[in-house]
Amino acid sequence: MVAKVYYEKAQSAKAEEALNWVIKSASEEGYRSLARLRLAGLMIDKGDFAQAKALLAEKVVAEFEPLVEDRLGDIDTLDKHSDTAKGHYLKSWRGLDAHAPYRKYVEAKLNAIGVDPTIDGTTSGVTSSSSKSTLESKDHQ
């Protein structure tokens, strides 16, 4: 929270300091993971892709893995590596719940590089209650 305030006031050095403190000091891995993601975002904004990748290479809680892939895709897109960006964005899209609003954002990034993740119908690990109920109703007809 403190880092966000600093960032919004254009005090990125203080925001970085606050996020680094969380990474080193927080007792909860989720907080450390979130701080790494946010700090990586600041590094991407600064154009320091090497530092951003180093932060994203650290272990994060499983729930944040699709967001790490999204950030890696952003780096590769900015670095003009659309083939590897595609792979990262697809991993992110497939890792997010089908109903997560952020998934549409990742899908837009994929569309921007010429990829439609819905073409093959792969939703890897995601279940849709509406498709399940449709299948069940067809079985009973």
Language model features with spans:
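Alpha-helical adaptor scaffolds
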Residues: M1-L67, L72
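Extracytoplasmic/luminal low-complexity segments enriched in Pro/Gly and acidic/polar residues
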Residues: V2, A98, Y102-Q141
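Alpha-helical linker/edge segments of TPR/alpha-solenoid repeat scaffolds
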Residues: E8-A15, G41-A52, L78-G87, N111-S129
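Aromatic-residue detector
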Residues: A18-W21, A54, D74-D76, R94, ...
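TPR/TPR-like (Sel1-like) alpha-helical repeat modules
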Residues: K24-S25, V60-A62, L78-P101, E107-N111
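TPR/TPR-like alpha-solenoid helical repeat scaffolds
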Residues: S33-L42, L67-D79, A100-P117
